Amino acid sequence: AEAGYDYHADEEGFYDGVIYRLWGIDRKDAAGIGYAKNHDASVMWANTALSEKVQDGDDLQFFVQQKNELLAFFTQTEQTVSKDQNAVLRLRTANGNQYKDCAGASIYIDGELQEGLVTDENGRVTLPALAPSDTPYFITAKKTKQADGEEYTVISAAYSRLTVIQAGEVSENYVKSVTLRNVLDWYEKKQ
C-alpha cells in the first residue's frame, strides 16, 4: 500500500482503492469513478474493472464523477479529412446499456472552446475546415448544468482525434492487426 498499490477492500467492500491511488485522488473528493468497457456502462463502477477480462481491441474508459455524469463518447475517435473539408462528429451518452444522442454539448479543439459550436439534437456537430497539421487535432466535448447555484459537468470527457491532410494527399493506412497461423504443419502434411 505504501507504493500506491491499495488492493484491499475498503469499509464498504470495494476494491477500487488502487484506481484512486493511481490518479492521486482522495476518495472523499469524488462521487465515484465511472468505468465502461466498449461503451457499455451497465456495470460502471471502477471496482469491477479490476476483475474484468480485457481482449485485444477492447475500449476501456474511466472517469471521475463530480455528481452523476453519464459516460459520453464520440462514435469516431479517429478521422482523417482533406484541407477545406468539414468533419462531422456524433456524440452519444450511455446510461447503463441505453444509448442516446447528446445535444447541447460545447466543442473544444485543442483545448480551446469553439464559440457557438455545439452538438445538435442528433448529437452531431460539423467542425469548421481546419488547416493541415503534422499532429492530429484533439476534439473534446463538455456539457454542464446549473443546480443549486452550482455549475457541474453532466457528461464524461469525450474525445476524437482529427487529422487534416493537404488536398490530394493520400492518407497512410496502417495494419491494425495480423493473424498468424502455423503453416508449417500444413506444409509438412503436403510433403
Task: Spell out what each predicted region is.
Residues 1-191:
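Ubiquitin-like/PB1-type beta-grasp interaction modules and other compact soluble beta-rich domains
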